[in-house]
Amino acid sequence: MGPGSQQKSEKLRSKSPLADMDGLHAQYVMLETIGHGGCATVKLAQHRLTGTHVAVKTIRKREYWCNRVISEVELLMMADHPNIISLLQVIETKKKVYLIMELCKGKSLYQHIRKAGYLQEHEARALFKQLLSAMNYCHNQGIVHRDLKPDNIMVEKDGKVKIIDFGLGTKVKPGQKLNLFCGTYPFSAPEVLLSTPYDGPKIDVWTLGVVLYFMVTGKIPFDACSIKKLVKRILAGKYSIPSRLSAELQDLLSLLMTANPKLRPTVAEVMVHPWVTEGSGVFPDPCEEQTPLKPDPAIVKAMGHIGFQAQDIEDSLRQRKFNQTMASYCLLKKQILKECDRPTRARPVNPSVTPFPSLVDTATTRLGLRRRENEPTCPWSSANRQVSVCGKSTSKKRDRRVSWPSVLGRPRHTAPTMDHTRTRTRSVPCICSMFCTVQPNSSEESTQGHTRASAADKPVHSRGWPRGIKGWTRMIGNAMRKLCCCIPSKETSHLGQNRVSPKK
């Protein structure tokens, strides 16, 4: 490893306050594997502090792959777009790099098309415009993906697209040529197969054409029984186009898959093509879900009660440190927004009176609070029980369920699952849902592979709180009341009243 790579590695390590294995498991419950590749695996995990599911990509650091690993981390740190997978935290050890990312709940574009056969043009247009928005953002940032294919594009249940896996991506300067041959043969541009210096953004345009063709036909444009014949067909740039496709779409496909890269359009030029702008020329706003530079004071105050420092929160967001503080803030804010978007089934109340949160489940738990300097306390541990990596408790006794006030925990809440139709009691998002296990469910597909989670096994819970904690819960409750305008009052909360979980 060269000195430049060592400096980059040290830079990454400095961004992570918990740079050891214990740090990873102290913050996340590792669940089942949901994807794997040549030098990396992706696991489903649960953030202990918020109970939110995340994807943890584990990359082994080897001499040959080290520069590529660092490149992927840096690219994800640069990217902040609603249609690009969000990086939340980086934890690095001597042998591994852990990338904690948001969990995309849906299917890959490949699975989506295989199930549908092919998409109608208006359906394909809705997805393709999101891809264009993301790739235009990347190219403006000097990022080239180089492996854009249906397996690396996630489609969530609400139709939102997320581009994942920047493992072959790189950073380029204007006019810079690339030499590395990489990607997948059926999606590779002719100039890459010729092993000549190529323009990075232009090969992304070619793969966008192959992906669009796959969406509207259910097939790839270039296919053959051998690599040699496949390369020959790609270099010739000849493929069949179904006559049922509109003239505008046929024209767009021919532009995207132009064999000569000099004649191939840029992504910005594709975005104004008549087929793309038909119906509406509006594209996703890149600022829609960007990480805030200035934190919400109410969230900061609430996080302060569980050990976070206000200045550390502000610095972590402004400098994009991708540490524990930044991850906790981002996951908590997403939970709050999700809760605020929920429809409520409450009794009519006096419109002139602002509802206040209710202490629905007043069961309390005992937590031993131990905190390092400038590090938030994560009160999920119990001195009388041990939790294995897979989340199963070694204790055979049935403990009481962990509960916070409704502003901090979900009352009567089972382990979160991928099942969006599961019912549960209405409450404001939890800061400390102490679920120590979520077992996989073989029936549900999800993200970066085939994510599965289940509530078949009961979650492990900690023991009861001492009575003296009531004052603390009231203090945190007061701080959290400002977080969400849709917090129900005690009059409208019922333990037996469940409702459908929100569509994520």
UniProtKB/Swiss-Prot annotation:
The protein's UniProt keywords, in alphabetical order, are: ATP-binding, Kinase, Nucleotide-binding, Serine/threonine-protein kinase, Transferase
Active-site residues are 147 (proton acceptor)
Q: Which residues form a coiled coil?
A: none
Stretches for region Disordered? 389-421, 441-468
Question: Which positions fall inside the UBA domain?
Answer: 294-334
Catalyzed reaction equations: L-seryl-[protein] + ATP = O-phospho-L-seryl-[protein] + ADP + H(+); L-threonyl-[protein] + ATP = O-phospho-L-threonyl-[protein] + ADP + H(+)
Q: What does the entry state regarding organ or tissue expression? A: Testis-specific. Expressed in the testis from 22 days postpartum (22 dpp).
**Where does the record place Polar residues bias?**
441-451
Record-annotated Protein kinase domain positions: 28-276
E.C. number(s) listed in UniProt: 2.7.11.1
UniProt cross-references to InterPro entries, sorted A to Z? Kinase-like_dom_sf, Prot_kinase_dom, Ser/Thr_kinase_AS
Where, in this chain's numbering, is ATP bound? Answer: 34-42, 57
Key word Kinase present in the record? yes
Q: Which GO terms describe its molecular function?
A: ATP binding; protein serine kinase activity; protein serine/threonine kinase activity
Catalytic EC class: transferase
Q: Which family does it belong to?
A: Belongs to the protein kinase superfamily. CAMK Ser/Thr protein kinase family. Smok subfamily.
Q: What does this protein do?
A: May play a role in sperm motility, especially in the regulation of flagellar function.
Q: What is this protein called?
A: Sperm motility kinase 3A
